[in-house]
Every structure is written in C-alpha cells, then in structure tokens.
Amino acid sequence: MNNLEHKELKPWRDESFKALIPFIAFVIFYFGFSIITQDFSRVPMTVAFIFSSAIALILNHKEKLNKKIEIFALGMGKKDIMIMCLIFVLAGAFTATAQAVGAVDSAVAIAQHFIPAKFIVSGIFVISALISLAVGTSCGTIAAVVPIAVTLAQSLGLNPAFLVGATVGGAMFGDNLSLISDTTIASTRTQNVEMRDKMIYNLRIVTVPAILCILLYMLPVFSNSNIDVTNVTINIDAYIKVMPYILLLIFGLMNINVMFLLLIGIILNTVIGIGFGEFDIWTAFSKMGDGTVSMANTLIVAMLAGGLLQMVRWNGGISYIINKTEHLIHNKKHCEFGVCFLVGVINLFTANNTVAIITAGPIAKEISEKYNVDPRRTASLLDTTSCFVQGIIPYGAQILIATSLAASVSLSSFSIIKCLLYPALTGLGLLVSLILAKK
C-alpha cells in the first residue's frame, strides 16, 4: 500500500453492480430527503456525500478498512480533482476582489446601459457563451459572470435564478464548441479527429437548441419590462474597473491557462482597487482570503465526489456499466445510442464531463469502428452528451460554483437547474439527432 499513490489502481474485480450501491444511496438520500422536505437546500450535499462515502468504505469485506480509506483518499487527491479545486480557490479570490473594487457594479451598469431590460437574460446567455468559447472553460466563465448576473438581477428586480441559469447555460454552450476546452481535447484525442471537424458536427446538434434558448429567455416570464434602464449612465472609471473581465476574454483567445487568467485577474483587481482608493493592500489580502474560504463547501464536495468515484471504479462499477452497454449494441444506430448512454451514465457517476469522456472514449472508438460510425460523429456525441448530463446534475462543478457564488441570494442547485434551459434543449436536440440518424 505504500506505493498506492505512485500507480493507477485497477479494479479488484472486472465488474460489479454492487459497486454502484454508494451512488444509488447518494441519490436516494439527497433526493429523498429533499423531496420529503420540499426544499433541496435543507440537505447539504456534503452530508449526502459523506453518507454515500461511508457505504462505499463498508463494501468489499475482503479488503482491510485502512486500504479502502487510502484508495478513497487517492481519489480525493487525483490530479483533475486538485486542478478543479485550484480553479475554485482562484475563482473565489477573483470574485471577492472584483466585488471589492466595484468591477461587478460597473459591469452591471454597462450591461444595463447597452442591453434592453427585456433582453437582459438572453444577453447574459450570449455574453457567457462568448467568454466560454474564448476561454475554453465553463467553470472559469461562471466564476467571472455569476456575480455580475446576481447583482444585475437584484438591480432589475428579476429572479436571480433566471440570470444565473442563463450564465451557466451560456458557459456550457461555449465550452461545448470551444476548440481549447478540456472536453473538446478529450473527445477529439480519443477518437483521433480534428477539433474543427468535431465543432462542425457539434453545431449540427446544438445550434437549434441554443437559438431556442435565446428566444425563450426573451419571453415576458424571464423579463421585467416595467423597468426603465435608459437613464443609466457610465463613465470611464466603469470601463477601467471591468478591464480584468475584458482581458479575461482577450487572453482566452490566446489559449492561456484559466488558472493563470484568474491569477492575472486577481492582480489587476488589486492594482485597480488600490489605484482608485477602494482599499489598501491589507484589505485586498483579506478579500482574497474571504473569497477562497467562501469556496470551502464546493472544495469539500469535489474531493468527496473524487473519492467516491475512485471507490466505485475500484470495486468494478465503471466496468459493469461499460460491459452492459456493449452487450446492448447490435447495429449502427444502437452504437450511437450506446455511446451516448455510456458517456452519460459515467458522467452521472463521476460528475466530471472530461473524466467521463476520457473513460468512455476508448470503448466508444472501438465499438464505433466496429459499426462504421464516423469518428467525428462519435467525438461530437461524447462531447454533447456529457454537456447535457453535466448541466442537469446538482453536484457538477458548474452548478456547485454557481450556487457558491450566488450564496448571497440563497439559490439552491435545483432552483438554478429549473431555469437552465440550454442543457434540456440540448438533450432534446441530441435525441432528435439520434433518431433521425441513418441506420
């Protein structure tokens, strides 16, 4: 066991439905109590994950508890989980310093000045999509835009869930198409296709859902047309204070790492804040600390989810899903449905679309070649399906970041998901695409 951290763990058995019990317990515990209380914010997700993690550690009596704990800890500390946590930490610090310098209020004023009130939700969706398309990460985009969306909703008297939902949806749409996103890289590499080709195939599926999403967000139910924003004035100070956001978009086009972008944003917020006399260096440090601490719940959930996934994989749960999927495939159409089912279920259990694509990708390539499915189509199905699933689970990174940054208005995961139109429309578009595909 001393060398556990230095090698990749293989499942102790080929496949086992029993390994999925902890996740089933999580679903029953979290959804069950939430439905009983009719309040999804009453049951902390951390408690649900602790409960299911305890069950995961109890399973497999053939191994000692110490070994299972080490395996669980190894999953908590995996590279992708730690990178995600670093993004959470930097996002918290960036948001806190941006709020302190007045960048959020300035961005709200600019948005109110240029976007009519009845189109504000659609406008946020488009802005979020463009930033995510440039930066290549939905998480980084959500971290930057959600504070603006919340403040904007409060100033316009709108339901914050509308704007936060539009932000998350737009970020996922942009991430799904971006040439530099992790999901694009993972799906194209596993299928050995060009990124541009995958994007073209993605557009065939998600263009109509995205347009429908924008049009639906223009409906009166999502707006407050009685508010007049024509008198909102802005000055040069407002543009200077939003420079970190603008540079985030510009640097994103240069394929710069999102963590580096957030770090640069924190530094710029600090320099601008001190320059405008909003705070001194010590207050800036304090704001950074407060921002990182505000993400603590999100960090805990991410690490517990990583540990739980490691136990499910080690006990043969992922192998079980893969093998059962392969047995249901008999022709080309079945193959496409199978690819979507495979990556979707794995995403459901891992809460990480990149990990789901990397896990399902090699199997998807093998069965796609067997049934003559275009690898560009397979890459697109992997990417789009994982985006759909990631947007409808309350414990995905995108929703967790959004709820953390919208804590001031007490938004639960499900209040955001109910207003998150894009993933649902994408799922519908994906289903239509699968049904209409040639056999």
Name the predicted role of every residue range:
Residues 85-94, 116-148, 326-366, 371, ...:
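Hydrophobic alpha-helical transmembrane segments of multi-pass integral membrane proteins
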Residues 2-3, 169-172, 176-234, 392, ...:
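Juxtamembrane and boundary regions of transmembrane helices in multi-pass small-molecule transporters
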Residues 17-29, 40-61, 84-90, 122, ...:
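Hydrophobic mid-bilayer segments of alpha-helices in multi-pass membrane transport proteins
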Residues 140-152, 168, 179-193, 321, ...:
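Re-entrant/interfacial helical elements at transmembrane boundaries that shape
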Residues 62-64, 77-81, 157-161, 186-199, ...:
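Juxtamembrane helix-boundary/capping and inter-helix hinge elements in multi-pass membrane proteins
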Residues 78-84, 109-127, 153-163, 235-243, ...:
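Membrane-interfacial loop-to-helix junctions in multi-pass transporters
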Residues 87, 118-131, 157-174, 334-347, ...:
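Alpha-helical transmembrane segments of multi-pass membrane proteins
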Residues 46, 50, 58, 69-102, ...:
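Core transmembrane alpha-helical segments of multi-pass membrane transporters/permeases
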